[in-house]
Amino acid sequence: IPKTTGVILCKHQSAWETIAMQLIFPRQSQVLKKELFYLPFFGWGLASLNPIAINRKLGTRAIKIILRLGAARIREGWWVLLFPEGTRVPYGSKGKYTQTGAALALEIKCPVIPVAHNAGAFWSKESFIKRPGCITVVIGESLPTCGKNRKQIMAEAETWIESTCEKL
């Protein structure tokens, strides 16, 4: 894990990684949907973690909020975690990757850190029941953003995340 902060792009298969990433990358701000705050107890605790909460119905305005608040958090020494597929996907599946994380990294001139794992095999999106097993997390090399555009950055991150997940 680099000493300087940046943008974390993590596969999103379960609730597990939302908790674990807080321990792996301390002093972190997650981009999440605002509706999670409405869950009793859980939402209240979540609000105390300094997340970047967005209303996904706002479309491009939500992206501008992520860029503004994300840049501020990184300048303050926080990691910013995004799930580039936008929502949890079933284990072994692939969602559509958005370019918001790459846009933030370019805005602040920081690297992107890709993260792959197999948590969805044990903490399934489809079930409340958790299965026993060993969750493996792989943190990729820091991906430089200098001289690249959003599409190139996301293609590199997506390829690494998906190919690494296939090996787990």
Predicted regions and their residues:
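Non-catalytic C-terminal accessory region of glycerolipid acyltransferases
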Residues: 64-168
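Short, flexible hinge/linker loops that cap or flank conserved catalytic cores
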Residues: 1-2, 45, 74, 106
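Generic beta-sheet signal
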Residues: 4-10, 78-82
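A short, glycine/Asx- and small/polar-enriched loop/turn
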Residues: 1-5, 131
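A short, conserved beta-strand element in the Rossmann-like catalytic core
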Residues: 1, 14-15, 87-88
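Structural motif corresponding to alpha-helix initiation and N-cap regions
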Residues: 3, 39, 64-67
